[in-house]
């Protein structure tokens, strides 16, 4: 299931957003479901990250977290949660036209808000 991922630095709340296309494959992989990815997407909608992180002061992208934290010049003491996080390898190979369209429709707000694409 979807879970919030955040860091705290000097009382600044930093939300870490994920590419919705990568996130969907990772959540499918972690679910140990034996139905196909197409069916799983429809049966298991993820919560929009836009809503999950609405109380955060800053949002950074998971795939570039080290660089983004460096640019913010915020000392974060513990990044082990980010270092241990599973990211589905070759996640973009999972997509067909149908699944790409499904994720794009289901998570349109996150894709537009955070500037993601497949």
Regions inferred by a protein language model and the residue ranges of each:
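Membrane-interface amphipathic segments in extracytoplasmic regions
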Residues: 1-118
